[in-house]
Amino acid sequence: MQDPASPIHRRSLVGGLEAAGLVVLAASLPSQARAEGDAARKVFEQALPNLPGQVLTAVVVEYAPGGKSPPHRHDASASVFAYVLSGSIRSQVEGGEVAVYRAGQHWFEPPGAHHVVSENASGTEPASLLAVLIAAAGARLTVYDP
């Protein structure tokens, strides 16, 4: 079995996602940056004909060295799959353990989960992840804590 963190496995997965149309024209889409040192860029959105009322959305989140996302929740209808593209990401969903995921690793966040830690694990190197969300059409995908 191939190591999921190997460069060949990563290339296969990313190539497969590109072939599926998840990563398209990323450079031409607007970026949403927040003061904490991350930028989120929607790269794809598609209604799912086999799941009426559901939409798949792909977002690339880029973290500057030491950057982080503020605590947040995703819609109660949203399942989140996160795949680390580069660097290392420290993540914690409320009630769970803090974990560090490296390039090629992934995790799942259940609908409505409170994401209390999402940050670059390095203070010197950038990091990025691909978040793929499946949620109800029109759902507010991310709501930051006040």
Predicted regions and their residues:
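N-terminal secretory signal peptides and thylakoid transit peptides that target proteins
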Residues: Q2-V24
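C-terminal segment of N-terminal export signals and the immediately downstream linker at the start
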Residues: A27-G53
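A short beta-loop-beta micro-motif enriched in histidine and acidic residues
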Residues: Q54, K68-Y83
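Conserved short histidine dyad/triad with adjacent acidic residue
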Residues: V59-D75, P110-G112
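Glycine- and acidic-residue-biased ligand/ion/polar-headgroup-sensing regions
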Residues: S77-G95, Q105
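Short acidic-glycine-tyrosine-enriched beta hairpin
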Residues: G95-G112
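Ligand-binding loop in jelly-roll beta-barrel domains
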Residues: G112-A139
